[in-house]
Amino acid sequence: MKILGLTGSIGMGKSTAAAMLRRLGVPVHDADATVHALFARGGKAVAAVDAAFPGVVRDGAVDRTALGAQVFGDGAALKRLEAIVHPLVRAAERDFLARHRRARTRLVVLDIPLLFETHGESRCDLVAVVSAPAFLQAARVLARPGMTRQRLDAVLAKQMPDGQKRRRADVVIPTGLGKGPALKRLKAVVAMMRGSRPAAPVGGDASKPPFY
């Protein structure tokens, strides 16, 4: 079974790329969705988060806004949260991979926002980085409810710069020109990893514009 790692900074279009891969028939393990499930009523992280951050659990689920207010700008608090969440996310990922190995699935995707930052590339056969011009990234993110420039800058400060991600990528997925070029590149990657076409040089180059 081949494993494609999918990552990209906030606002780059990673969720759209993951949805395209699902439509191409590739199973996707979404780390963010796993966190949402862990924080939901009955989720495996609720009790531990409640103990570490009193007052953030309401009606049996983690209130992400309240949690964010306690963690935002506090590096020590963030590390406490990560110590709770990351092992549970990895356990869910291992279950996903084991299930698809048993099913003899040929290709799966690990959708991980902080893939390089957490050294997740070591678990992947190939890493795809979703990228767009910085001005478009900012416009997308600032259009989200409750998002401010300060919050965006804080998120970006915790993420590897886009140029560095592209330099480390095996393939760059462009989203700056719309869905068409992104889908074309993803189809080529899927075909290559499934073995239905020869390998081709599809890597990124940080010295070039990210597919404007």
From Swiss-Prot:
Enzyme Commission identifier(s): 2.7.1.24
The UniProt entry, under SUPFAM superfamilies, shows: P-loop containing nucleoside triphosphate hydrolases
Where does this protein reside within or beyond the cell?
Cytoplasm
Q: Which residues form a coiled coil?
A: none
- Catalytic activity annotated for this protein? 3'-dephospho-CoA + ATP = ADP + CoA + H(+)
Domain named DPCK: residues? 3-204
Keywords from the named record:
ATP-binding, Coenzyme A biosynthesis, Cytoplasm, Kinase, Nucleotide-binding, Transferase
* GO cellular component terms, semicolon-separated: cytoplasm
**Any one Gene Ontology BP term:** coenzyme A biosynthetic process
Molecular function (Gene Ontology), one example: ATP binding
List the PROSITE patterns hit by this protein, alphabetically: DPCK
Pathway linked to the protein: Cofactor biosynthesis; coenzyme A biosynthesis; CoA from (R)-pantothenate: step 5/5
Which residues are recorded as binding ATP? G11, M12, G13, K14, S15, T16
Q: Which family does it belong to?
A: Belongs to the CoaE family.
Main function: Catalyzes the phosphorylation of the 3'-hydroxyl group of dephosphocoenzyme A to form coenzyme A.
* Designated name of the protein: Dephospho-CoA kinase
Q: What broad taxonomic lineage does this protein's source fall under? A: Bacteria, Pseudomonadati, Pseudomonadota, Alphaproteobacteria, Rhodospirillales
Q: Which gene encodes it?
A: coaE
